[in-house]
UniProtKB/Swiss-Prot annotation:
Belongs to the bacterial ribosomal protein bS21 family. One of its GO terms (cellular component) is ribosome. InterPro entries: Ribosomal_bS21, Ribosomal_bS21_CS, Ribosomal_bS21_sf. One of its GO terms (molecular function) is structural constituent of ribosome. This is Small ribosomal subunit protein bS21. GO terms for biological process: translation.
Length: 58
C-alpha cells in the first residue's frame, strides 16, 4: 500500500494529490480493476495474445 508523510505546512489537497499520483505510479487502481472479477486462465491467455498481436501490427 502506498504511504505518504504529510508535511507540517502541507494542505490536505496537495497531500491527497501526491497520494493519488503515487498510487497511479504503483499501479494500484489498474490492479484492483484487473482483480475485480475472476478471469479464467484461458481468457487471460487469449487477451495476452491479442495484445501482443496489436503491438506487433502497430
Amino acid at each position: 500500500m502506498s504511504e505518504i508523510k504529510v508535511g507540517e505546512n502541507e494542505t490536505l489537497e496537495s497531500a491527497l494529490r501526491r497520494f493519488k499520483k503515487k498510487c497511479a505510479r504503483a499501479g494500484v487502481l489498474s490492479e484492483v480493476r484487473k482483480r475485480e472479477h475472476y478471469e479464467k486462465p484461458s481468457v487471460k491467455k487469449k487477451k495476452k495474445s491479442e495484445a501482443a498481436r496489436k503491438r506487433k501490427f502497430k
